[in-house]
Each structure stands twice: as C-alpha cells, then as structure tokens.
C-alpha cells in the first residue's frame, strides 16, 4: 500500500479534521487525524492490517493501547494468526487488565493508530518487555511525529502537521476554541 493511497483514504473518509485540537500528548495542533472515521469501514482496516502484517514474521501476539488502536490491532492479529491483547489506562499508566498476559519470549507486535510523540507506543513497548515477551516491532497507520520517538516504528504514511506546545500555541493566542477529540483525557492549559 503506497502512502498516496493511505492519504486518499484519510481524505475520502473525512479523517483529516482542521481546527484547534488537544492531542493525547498534551500538545496542540491545527489538524487532527480522526482515525475512527477510517475504522468505520472494515475493508479499510483490513487493507491496513494486511499491509502491516506483511512487514513482520512469526508474530505470536499483537498488543494495542486502548481505545483507538483496538480495531486495527485486532485486524493485524487476525492477519498474522496471532492472539490479540490490549493495554488500558489505570491510574494514568497503561497496564494489562482482564486477565491479559504475555508469555516470556512470545513474539509480540505493538500496533498503534497514530503516532505523534510515541508516548503510548513506548508505554506498551515497555509493558511487553517487562512481561518477558519479545517486542518485534511497533507499527502504525499514521506517523505525525515532529521529534524523536523513543521506540523504532514503521507507519503506512508519514504526514507533517503543525504541533504546538500549549504555552506557545498561536491558535490559543487567537482565541480559537480548543477541541479534545482523543481517547485519553489530558487537562488543557
């Protein structure tokens, strides 16, 4: 799947929103990737999952952070014949709940939807490693990172959108209302 195809799907399904957004990282942006608009379409998710699955060999488990990446992670697990787990926030940290456990040495792929700072992906990566499992990679649909990401990853498409620290956000300075569409609540500044 070529980057242009992914960008076309983002545009076609109304997944690129313009405005003033609070990202899950706590930063602000004038553009938000509303991946849920893509995930309404199983054929789109399956296409992404098939491509991501082709990048990795012998995956035994797929782990995604809840909530947004769950549909994609599940589809990648199906494509790799692996089991699927997800990590949830508890007291601010991503943890396994609901009896989810990884086995020592289990070849585990971390699947994210959008990577901005890589914080959630890094948390899941650390969780996988702490369990004794082998983290074989991190994959995402969209890479919108603007700086170094602590864990190596691959994405279907790389996009560049403006990202601002809350204290230096020109949209805040103009009084543009801030929207918080993401799945993780971060207090606004």
Where are these regions (language model features)?
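Short, glycine/charge-rich flexible loops or terminal/linker lids adjacent to PRPP-binding catalytic cores
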Residues: 67, 72-109, 117-122
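PRPP-dependent phosphoribosyltransferase catalytic core
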Residues: 3-9, 125-189
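Alpha-helix C-terminal capping segments
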Residues: 52-58, 76, 145-150
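Active-site-facing substrate-recognition patch
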Residues: 1-58, 185-189
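Short, well-ordered alpha-helices that flank and scaffold nucleotide-derived cofactor binding pockets
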Residues: 50, 54, 74, 78, ...
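Conserved acidic residues
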Residues: 60, 106, 136
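Short glycine-rich phosphate-binding loop at a beta-alpha junction
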Residues: 59-66
């Amino acid at each position: 799947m070529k980057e242009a195809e992914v960008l076309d799907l983002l545009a076609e399904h109304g997944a690129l929103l313009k405005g003033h957004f609070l990202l899950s990282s706590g930063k602000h942006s004038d553009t938000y990737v509303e991946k849920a608009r893509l995930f309404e379409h199983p054929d789109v998710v399956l296409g992404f999952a098939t491509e991501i699955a082709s990048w990795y060999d012998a995956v035994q488990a797929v782990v995604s952070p809840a909530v947004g990446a769950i549909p994609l992670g599940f589809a990648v697990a199906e494509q790799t014949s692996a089991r699927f787990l997800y990590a949830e926030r508890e007291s601010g940290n991503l943890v396994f709940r609901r009896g989810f456990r990884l086995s020592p040495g289990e070849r585990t792929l971390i699947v994210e939807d959008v990577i901005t700072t890589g914080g959630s992906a890094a948390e899941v990566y650390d969780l996988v490693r702490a369990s004794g499992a082998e983290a074989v990679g991190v994959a995402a649909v969209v890479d919108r990172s603007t700086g170094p990401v602590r864990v190596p990853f691959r994405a279907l498409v790389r996009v560049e959108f403006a990202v601002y620290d809350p204290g230096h956000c020109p949209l805040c300075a103009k009084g543009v209302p801030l929207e918080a569409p993401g799945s993780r609540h971060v207090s606004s500044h």
